[in-house]
Amino acid sequence: MRLKSLFKHVCTPDALDMIDHYQTRTERLADLWVHVAGLSLASIGGIVLAVLSAIYGGPGTVIATAIYALCLVAMLTTSTIYNWTNPCAARPVLRRMDEAAIFLMIAGSYTPFTTQRFEGMWAIGFTVAVWAIAFAGVAVKLVAPRISDAFWSGVYVLFGWLAVVALKPMLDTVHPVALGLLVLGGLIYTAGVFVFISPRVKYRRAIWHGFVVAGAGVHWAAVLVGVVLAPTLAPAIA
C-alpha cells in the first residue's frame, strides 16, 4: 500500500507541472537549439576525452572521464526531454529525473579529479563524499514533495563549490590552468542560477541552459587539461 501511495505521489502532477515552460514559440525553439548544441558538444567531447584518455592515461583515467561524460550527457538528455515536453501526466516524473540528474553531473564532474589527481585518503574520502551526496540528492529529488527552485538552486551551487573544502590537494595536484578553468566554470554556473530564479526574464530557460552549456564546456576543458593531459604537463604542477 505504501509503495502504491508513493508511486501516486511521484506521478501526480501539481499546478506548476501543468504550466507551459515557454511564453512563445520562439522561446521554445531557442531553448531547444541550446539543448541540441549542448548535447552535440557533450557527445563529441566525451568521445574526444575517451580517445585522449586511452592515449595519455591508463584504465583509471578512461573510466573516470567516461563517468564524467556519461553524467553530463545524461543531465542534458533529461533536461531536453523534460523541458520540451508539453504539460501532461508524465511531467512530474520527467521533472524529477531532470533535477536528479544534476546531482549526478556534479558528482561526475568531480570524479576525474578526485580519483586521478587526489592521493591517499583525499582521493578515497572526497570521492565517496561527493557520490554519497549525489545519491542522497537523487533519492530526495525522486520522491520528496516539491520545494522551491530557489532552494534547490542553492543546494546545487553549494554542492558545486564543495571543492573549496579540498583546496589544498587541488592546489598540490591540479594544473593551475585547470584550476582556473574550474573556478571560471563554477562562476558561470552560479551566474546562470540568478537568471533561472528570475521568472520575469525573457528567454529565461534558454539563457539559463546557455549558462549551463558554457559552464560545462569550461569544465570539459578543465578535465582535458587537468586530468587527461596531466601526464604531459606534470612538470608545471611541481
What do the predicted segments below correspond to?
Residues 2-238:
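Multi-pass alpha-helical transmembrane bundles in non-GPCR membrane proteins
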